[in-house]
Amino acid sequence: MSFEVFEKLEAKVQQAIDTITLLQMEIEELKEKNRSLSQEIQNATSGRESLAHENEQLKQEQQVWQERLRALLGKMEDVQ
């Protein structure tokens, strides 16, 4: 009788070990996915900052061109 109890206990312990091993593997997979997503977020943030800087430069260029165009139109009106 005690041998049967020991076998059942051994089976339960082995099942617990298997479950723990699977959970550890899942944790490692989730950690890797988390690292990957963190890198993607960092890249996206960097890209956003770059685009914001480029946008600001383009706005400044547009402002310069608008001022030049206004000056040119003013000269054309003076000629007429």
Swiss-Prot record:
Belongs to the ZapB family. It is found in: Cytoplasm. InterPro entries: Cell_div_ZapB. Non-essential, abundant cell division factor that is required for proper Z-ring formation. It is recruited early to the divisome by direct interaction with FtsZ, stimulating Z-ring assembly and thereby promoting cell division earlier in the cell cycle. Its recruitment to the Z-ring requires functional FtsA or ZipA. HAMAP family: ZapB. It comes from the Bacteria. Disulfide bonds: none annotated. Keywords: Cell cycle, Cell division, Coiled coil, Cytoplasm, Septation. One of its GO terms (cellular component) is cytoplasm. This is Cell division protein ZapB. One of its GO terms (biological process) is division septum assembly. It comes from Photorhabdus laumondii subsp. laumondii (strain DSM 15139 / CIP 105565 / TT01) (Photorhabdus luminescens subsp. laumondii). Residues 3-80 form a coiled coil. Homodimer. The ends of the coiled-coil dimer bind to each other, forming polymers. Interacts with FtsZ. Its main location: cytoplasm. It holds the Pfam family ZapB.
